Amino acid sequence: MHMPVAGPHTHTLFTVSRTMLTVVAALTPATLFGLWEFGWPAIFLFLTTVVSAWVFEVACLKIADKPIRPFATDGSAILSGWLVAMTLPPYAPWWVGVIGSFIAIVIAKHLFGGLGQNLFNPAMVARAMLVVALPVQMTTWIAPVGLLEGPSFLHGLSITFLGSQEFDAVSSASTLSHIKSQISAGATMGEILPTLADLESRLLGFVPGSLGETSTVLLALGGLLLLVTRIITPTIPLAVLGTLVTLSAICSFLAPDRFAPPILHLTSGSTMLCAFFIATDYVTSPVTTAGKWVYGIGIGTLVFVIPLRRLPRGRGLCGALDELGHAPDRNLHPAADLRTVPHRQAACAAKPAKGAQK
């Protein structure tokens, strides 16, 4: 009797928990910057969102009768809650964060079987559903004034947990929202660009936006950490950013009065968060190199095209599910792998092991 021979095992220092911890570390600089710039309301919202995500994780594990300790401490729930919090307006009410965590953990993750079984990135599902269900709360932007100059501790509690509206006096439009409104009013890009924040402010993050998405530099540095530690490969980020730059450069050259230059796309919204942290999600992205290129180009194209349709925060998270616009691209990744897997590899995978049928 012939017994099938087990395949070789790949060993790595990066367990699930270590991988999640590394991603959290990469997100930390941009997150801390956002918390400092937007102050106490952002801090309270962030903590509420992350803690509620972990609580929902434990509850789902308990209901499913799964071991709580290994899954609740692997960092996946914390990371999902962290990403949800980073995509929220900094002065959003506490219940927006809790609902976002519920959607991410209960609906987008455990409803499909838990870690590794989700069809879409849980945080992006939460973001998409929140934008559709709560457009006002999800499109209210605040100009960053710093922790010391912003609302006090007690005032921050009032804003986050009691719904105080006193902050309306300092509310502002995000870069993308401002451009859309001005174009709708008939202004040209040449007239709009001088009214935007300068390049330095957009790079560093001194602009209105979501809690952890404003600093292009810090998010890019976090992405570089993921590349250096080999948590991700450069293929998908290069495909996303390269496609976005190429399309915006062509359109800006052909119609400069209507289309923004590439640098504005790279420093607006959450392009870097998308390219390095969302599009590279292990579960929802391809594994073959060619598949990653196809997948990244698809996301980069959608990131450029969706704002042209006047959808709210169309670039938003630049991920596969942002405002539901990127959902089809996430669903295509198995097809991208199937079409791009080497023929020899596919043939070997289809051939039964010697003696397996005996």
From Swiss-Prot:
It is found in: Cellular chromatophore membrane. It is an enzyme of class 7 (translocase). One of its GO terms (cellular component) is plasma membrane-derived chromatophore membrane. The keyword Translocase applies. Induction: Expression is reduced under iron-limiting conditions. Its EC number is 7.-.-.-. The chain crosses the membrane at residues 16-36, 38-58, 68-90, 128-148, 206-226, 236-256, 286-306. GO terms for biological process: electron transport chain; nitrogen fixation; transmembrane transport. HAMAP family: RsxD_RnfD. Part of a membrane-bound complex that couples electron transfer with translocation of ions across the membrane. Required for nitrogen fixation. Involved in electron transfer to nitrogenase. Belongs to the NqrB/RnfD family. PANTHER family: ELECTRON TRANSPORT COMPLEX PROTEIN RNFD, ION-TRANSLOCATING OXIDOREDUCTASE COMPLEX SUBUNIT D. This is Ion-translocating oxidoreductase complex subunit D. It comes from Rhodobacter capsulatus (Rhodopseudomonas capsulata).
